[in-house]
Amino acid sequence: MFNKNQGSNGGSSSNVGIGADSPYLQKARSGKTEIRELEAVFKKFDVNGDGKISSKELGAIMTSLGHEVPEEELEKAITEIDRKGDGYINFEEFVELNTKGMDQNDVLENLKDAFSVYDIDGNGSISAEELHEVLRSLGDECSIAECRKMIGGVDKDGDGTIDFEEFKIMMTMGSRRDNVMGGGPR
């Protein structure tokens, strides 16, 4: 999910929201869909919803992608990304990490990779059961009924599953437990 071309360039950032003057956010805003997609992906990483990604949350995502990463390496990765120095990755740092040297094709590839994680049986669609299994592996205690509601919110053809095009819509909407429960995007 992360851009392999990233580097570390000191500086500070604010956790009070997204700095409008951030060059990375300005670049991402050049495609409004891209920033919404990044926000949705950030929310998936930010399992507890506190607005930042911890090494534990990063580890859960990496494990779900089939990569067992030792805690020390996760902490080192966080330190390299964490310009604010608080031990977490905030949204602005996440956008910077995921937009440095990236174009729309890279974003599309990242979404395809994410889709393949959720499409456990590889049949080209994601069922409520597959969504449930992946979200639970990430620490999200959602029910099958909630997963069905999430899928129902973007299932344009009514087949009870989501294909890649519907998945892109779901990621853009940030469709997750918060939307299912009527809270809307965080």
UniProtKB/Swiss-Prot annotation:
Binding site for Ca(2+) 1: 46, 48, 50, 52, 57
The organism's taxonomic lineage, starting at the top: Eukaryota, Viridiplantae, Streptophyta, Embryophyta, Tracheophyta
Cross-referenced InterPro entries: EF-hand-dom_pair, EF_Hand_1_Ca_BS, EF_hand_dom, EF_hand_pair_protein_CML-like
Protein name according to UniProt: Probable calcium-binding protein CML25
Residue positions binding Ca(2+) 3: 155, 157, 159, 161, 166
Its job: Potential calcium sensor.
Sequence segments annotated as region (Disordered): 1-23
Sequence positions that bind Ca(2+) 2: 119, 121, 123, 125, 130
Sorted UniProt keywords: Calcium, Metal-binding, Repeat
PROSITE patterns to which the protein is assigned, alphabetical: EF_HAND_1, EF_HAND_2
Any Gene Ontology biological process: root hair elongation
Pfam families per record: EF-hand_7
Designated gene of the protein: CML25
Segments forming domain EF-hand: 33-68, 69-104, 106-141, 142-177
Ranges of biased composition (kind: Low complexity): 1-17
GO cellular component: cytoplasm; nucleus
GO molecular function, one term: calcium ion binding
